[in-house]
Each structure stands twice: as C-alpha cells, then as structure tokens.
Amino acid sequence: MTSTRKRKKGEVPIVIPSMGRPDLLNTHKVMLPERLDICVPDSEVEKYQKAHPDLFIVGHPDSVKGISAKRQWIYETYGDVVMIDDDIGKFACLEYAVGEKSRFLDPTAATSLCDRLTEEAKQFGVYLFGVSASAVPHYYVSGLPYRTWGWVNGGFTGLIAGSKLAYNTEIASSEDYWISALNAYHHRKCLIDTRYALVDVFGNGTMKTKGGMSFTRNLERESRDIEILQRFFGDAIKRRGRMGVAHQIHEHQKMLEIPWAKMM
C-alpha cells in the first residue's frame, strides 16, 4: 500500500522508516504527527496501526529488505521527500546555548524546517540536503550556517526528484555515506543547514536497541560496508580514528573526504 494522502502546496512528504519496533517509535512526539508517513513492511502495518491508531502508516512490499532498499523504495514512491529516523527525541537549534529554552524546536517549527529546506534545496539546485550530524555546540561555526559539500547524515535525509542518485542495496548500514559520495560524484554539491541537528532518544545504541537497523547492523557488516564504499569511491572513504572531541563508537567508523572540499 502506498501513500495517497493529499498535501498542501509547499508541504514535502515526511517519511519515517521503521521496522519491528512500534513501541519505540518517538519522532511523532516532536513533529506534527499528522504530517508524517510511518513506512513499515506490509506485514507490520496492522501491528503499527494498532500501536498508533492516530498515525498514518504506509506499507512497502516485504520483499524490500534492508535500509538501503527501503530508502530507494521511498525515493521512487515519493520523489521529493524528507526521511527522518524513527527514534528522534529533539530537534536542536545550535544558534542557542545549551540550557536556553529556544535551543529545541517545537513540533511546528521542526516540521516547517523540512518544508523550508526542501524549497531552499530546489532554489539552490541540489538533490541532497540535510542538517548537521552533531548537536554538540563545539562543532557549530556561526559564520558557516550552510555547507554545500560533505556527508549528509541519514537521520535527516532530504532528496529531490529527478537526480542520478540511487541507493546500493549491498550497503547494510552506511547508506548515508553511499548516497553522499554518489551525490558528490554526480551532482557535486548538496545543502546542509548546520544550524540544526537531531538528537535521538537512544544515544549511540543502534546495535543495542531492538528492531530497525539492529537486525542487520553489526561490526562485520560495518567492515563490509567500508570495503564496498572504497571499491566505488576509493580513498574518499577513510576509516576514522579518534578526532578531537569525537567519540569513537567502534573500529569501523568512517568519514567521507571530498577532494575539492579541501580547497573551499
């Protein structure tokens, strides 16, 4: 079953990929729930509807397996779309200091951010857009509110229809690196609003929580993802050690180093 709902002009589809954890769904609490499509396998639609009768549940074929295939199905089905993780607890605005009330967006502002960035991406002529990968104030540079190159974190992935982008279903859990590198190859630029970032409710626990990517994400698959990424994109994909205040979660963490970004 696919989405047939009508949207007002200027409203981008906001899709929440989820699987196997209706009880852990949280993003609808920090956005306008009536704007969200919760995308789950067909076999789980009834379970999600029972747990969340007020939410709009969209089913995809059970044959669509893995986060890469799921994102590809969503992109092909919706076209212009913003995909947001199902475990988001807060939308942070990094222009405000820690402790300030305005640091976190209310549901209306969080939802409007998706619409605004979609329109800005179209005006700028990019196909991939997102927000900062970290809510740590240390990383925010006030003089660089937008970045036009780099890695777009999968927690907030915005795509515009008509691109040369497609997900590689061999990739188990690094699909955001794949799509960011492929975008750099084909389209050169993206749009990242560094003033905003997502805060999930579990911290760095993807491999420890149930459902979702925990079904496929483990150190062996992370290592294989790096091999696949390096096969296609060479030394633009590097293993990441301890860098500054960054916390190394596991040995197979990676980074995308776009060659021409060094000159900017």
Region spans (language model):
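Short, well-formed alpha-helical segments that are part of the catalytic scaffolds
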Residues: 13-36, 40-51
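Short acidic, S/G/P-rich loop/turn micro-motifs used as interaction or catalytic elements
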Residues: 19-23, 45, 88-91, 136-138
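Conserved catalytic core of nucleotide-sugar-dependent glycosyltransferases
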Residues: 91-177
